[in-house]
């Protein structure tokens, strides 16, 4: 039997992970990034950008449920949601499940990502691009949040790692723009890497966000594709009560929403804000 082709991730220099490639569905360099989608027997369809895995069919639900339902249920009455990035459509899919949300704006820098994900990752978007509340804007995320006249209750930054095009979504200019277009009491969340391997990323985000928001923290989830431990999500708001809501309050909102999830539940919601001591110590050691 012929040996299967392997695809190796290049995020770290000294170690990494690989996937057996059963079939390459798409591989092309766009104006902004090198994209590949291939099939793997264990993880289904896998999408990678610039040598780094972004999403797989097998475990994407963990990431997307935690990035959407945690801020939306903590907020309690979000009407207008902004997604930065998220071209695969799975973040949009989860937001559309909240029937009280009135508008969903998604800003994606690369129109090519949206078009090929609609074709090659249909399970990710599950038809959500056709939701009448949805509006797609092709623009740079930093430019959008600093120029738009719209305001939002929840902003979700579905950013790549802070390299290449994704680097700008970890800058003070981006965070300041998000604060600018966030309604009072609104919540900003962002992907912030696997903290055991990318601790400096979390520290840097915490320091920058603290200039614009009075309550900055992280919550976490374990996602197999993003190897190396727990993945952290940045959390920023000016309402510190939202991070400390009881499980009973979240439970009531969850039941009222009618959501059926595969990973998220109210107990996971409140527990996710408990962080490992090494991350707490690293954040506490930073100058104020």
Swiss-Prot record:
**According to the UniProt record, what happens if one changes residue 160 to A?**
Reduction of aminopropyltransferase activity
Outcome of swapping residue 159 to A:
Reduction of 23% of the aminopropyltransferase activity
Q: Which InterPro entries match?
A: PABS, PABS_CS, SAM-dependent_MTases_sf, Spermi_synthase, Spermidine_synt_N, Spermidine_synt_N_sf
Explain the activity's dependence on pH: Optimum pH is 7.5.
| Subunit structure, as described in the record | Homodimer.
Task: Please describe what this protein does.
Answer: Involved in the biosynthesis of polyamines which play a significant role in the structural and functional organization in the chromoid of E.coli by compacting DNA and neutralizing negative charges. Catalyzes the irreversible transfer (ping-pong mechanism) of a propylamine group from the amino donor S-adenosylmethioninamine (decarboxy-AdoMet) to putrescine (1,4-diaminobutane) to yield spermidine. Cadaverine (1,5-diaminopentane) and spermidine can also be used as the propylamine acceptor.
In its UniProt entry, what is this protein called?
Answer: Polyamine aminopropyltransferase
Q: Which organism is it from?
A: Escherichia coli (strain K12)
């Amino acid at each position: 039997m012929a040996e299967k082709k392997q695809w190796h991730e290049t995020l770290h220099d000294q170690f990494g992970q690989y996937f057996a490639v059963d079939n390459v569905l798409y591989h092309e360099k766009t104006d902004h990034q090198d994209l590949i989608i291939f099939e793997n027997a264990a993880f289904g369809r896998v999408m990678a950008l610039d040598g780094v895995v972004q999403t797989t069919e097998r475990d994407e639900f963990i990431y997307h449920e935690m990035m959407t339902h945690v801020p939306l249920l903590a907020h309690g009455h979000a009407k207008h949601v902004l997604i930065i990035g998220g071209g695969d459509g799975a973040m949009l899919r989860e937001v559309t499940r909240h029937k009280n949300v009135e508008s969903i704006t998604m800003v994606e820098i690369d129109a090519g990502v949206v078009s090929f994900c609609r074709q090659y990752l249909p399970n990710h978007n599950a038809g959500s691009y056709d939701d009448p509340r949805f509006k797609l804007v092709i623009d740079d995320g930093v430019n959008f949040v600093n120029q738009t006249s719209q305001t939002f209750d929840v902003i979700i930054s579905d950013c790549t790692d802070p390299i290449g095009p994704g680097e700008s979504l970890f800058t003070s200019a981006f965070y300041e723009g998000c604060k600018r277009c966030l309604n009072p009491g609104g919540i900003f969340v962002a992907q912030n890497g696997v903290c055991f391997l990318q601790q400096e990323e979390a520290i840097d985000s915490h320091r920058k966000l603290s200039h614009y928001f009075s309550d900055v923290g992280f919550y976490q989830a374990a996602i197999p594709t993003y190897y190396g431990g727990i993945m952290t999500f940045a959390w920023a708001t000016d309402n510190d009560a939202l991070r400390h809501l009881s499980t009973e309050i979240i439970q009531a909102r969850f039941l009222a929403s009618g959501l059926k999830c595969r990973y998220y539940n109210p107990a996971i919601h409140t527990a996710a804000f408990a962080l490992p001591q090494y991350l707490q110590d690293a954040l506490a050691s930073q100058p104020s």
